[in-house]
Amino acid sequence: AQRGWTPAFYSIHEELLPIFDSMGWEHFSVGEETVVDLPEFDLVGKAREKIRQPVTRAEREGMHTEWGSWRELSAALTVQIEEISEAWVAEKALPEMGFTLGGIAEARDPEVRLLLAIDADGRVQGVTSWMPSWTDGVQTGWTLDFMRRAADGPNGVMEFLIAKAALRMRDEGIAVMS
């Protein structure tokens, strides 16, 4: 506060909150991380019905996915991603909170992978980006960083993308998705 700055801590684990409380600091939740244990993940049974339905509906309507880095995607796809992102940002009253989720610049990183939902007409309806996570120098997971959906896109496209990402990662031997 010496220069008018207010220090802040982000992504604090719950067990540390009493320390901050004892110093008189306030805290609030910006969001919560969901961690999916991929070896056990599937879309079978009543418990997964709300995840399975958007996947089944999207596939029935001709939706498919494409996975790759920004450089691996065609120019036609990257232009659509940029258009979707620009439209999404323009609709928001506030600027993006870059400290919680990434933007288009991070999606271009060569280590980041994108999963696109592409409809039967070849139009991108949604996109997610995934940053690799590492344990002891070995990639063990992917972390969701960027989510965009076409303004006129079908309901359930994000559920479709996240479920398809989980299944793909599981099949590739990845342990964790968050």
Residue ranges and their predicted role:
Residues 1, 5, 9-33, 38-54, ...:
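A conserved beta-strand-loop-helix scaffold within acyl/acetyltransferase catalytic domains
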